[in-house]
UniProtKB/Swiss-Prot annotation:
GO BP annotation list: gluconeogenesis; glyceraldehyde-3-phosphate biosynthetic process; glycerol catabolic process; glycolytic process
CDD domains: TIM
Lineage: Bacteria, Pseudomonadati, Pseudomonadota, Gammaproteobacteria, Thiotrichales
Gene this protein is translated from: tpiA
Identification of the protein by name: Triosephosphate isomerase
Organism: Hydrogenovibrio crunogenus (strain DSM 25203 / XCL-2) (Thiomicrospira crunogena)
Coiled-coil regions listed: none
Enzyme Commission number(s) from the entry: 5.3.1.1
Subcellular location: Cytoplasm
Complexes and interactors: Homodimer.
Pathway connected to this protein: Carbohydrate biosynthesis; gluconeogenesis; Carbohydrate degradation; glycolysis; D-glyceraldehyde 3-phosphate from glycerone phosphate: step 1/1
Keyword Isomerase: yes
Length: 253
């Protein structure tokens, strides 16, 4: 039985005052979510501050991105995997659709980052997903297969035992639109099936989160699906009550 995992992606939001308020709210109810893994991923500049605000042992810390380079060096503006580890991160989000679309990250870039993260002892949260145009033109499966295959080619299928996958339909991110529970389940089952062709044992163990406008009012239905193992939460993770409610919905499964 896979443990459900809910991670909050704060994106480029927050300051010390708002983070203190948010984390105080999370700490107050962190023990109410049941047997659920919970993490928050603040902006890099606030990682250390957030860690110091979090109640030890209840909520894990993650980065939103990291450098492709495996060692520190002359890479202005970048954050290395070792730096994320040094401030207490366990996870790092890689391949988010915003990184792909806005910053031009390729499948090969993301695959290299996944390898660097794994080699550094971080658990990558690998984001995959299709645009509305790709879905409507029947390319959903080929797009997601290509995204997965790039990483499998780089690290091998066995390494996926240490990877979290987040399916994020690009058309449902920040739009208020959500894939139906059945639509999401169908894609999650497809992802697991693709991995199972190479290693059924690893496929069964891999946590596959759903990311795409998850809210307290739709979390239970999404998380009740057999191949949906939690969520990568954007906007709702900036509200302590909403994020805790989503985590509680995971804990009730």
């Amino acid at each position: 039985m896979r443990q459900l995992f809910v991670a909050g992606n704060w994106k480029m939001h927050g300051d010390k005052a708002s983070i203190k308020t948010l984390v105080t709210g999370l700490n107050a109810k962190a023990d109410s979510v049941g047997d659920v893994l919970v993490a928050v991923c603040p902006p890099a500049i606030y990682l250390d501050y957030t860690k110091n605000c979090l109640m030890a042992g209840e909520i894990a810390l993650g980065g939103q991105n990291m450098a492709i380079e495996p060692v520190q060096g002359a890479y202005t503006g970048e954050t290395s995997a070792s730096m994320l580890k040094d401030v207490g991160c366990q996870y790092v989000i890689l391949g988010h659709s915003e990184r792909r679309a806005i910053y031009g990250e390729t499948d090969q870039d993301i695959a290299a980052k996944v390898k660097t993260a794994l080699d550094s002892g971080l658990t990558p949260i690998l984001c995959v997903g299709e645009t509305l145009e790709e879905r409507e033109s029947g390319q959903l499966e080929s797009v997601i297969s290509q995204q997965l295959d790039a990483v499998i080619s780089e690290v091998g299928i066995d390494q996926f035992a240490d990877v979290v996958i987040a399916y994020e339909p690009v058309w449902a991110i920040g739009t208020g639109k959500t894939a139906s529970a059945q639509q999401a389940q169908d894609v999650h089952a497809f992802i697991r099936g693709q991995l199972a062709k190479l290693n059924p044992s690893v496929a069964e163990k891999v946590i596959i989160q759903y990311g795409g406008s998850v809210k307290p009012n739709n979390a239970s239905e999404l998380f009740s699906q057999p191949d949906i193992d939690g969520g990568l939460i954007g906007g709702a993770s900036l509200n302590a009550d909403d994020f805790i409610a989503i985590c509680q919905a995971a804990g009730e499964q």
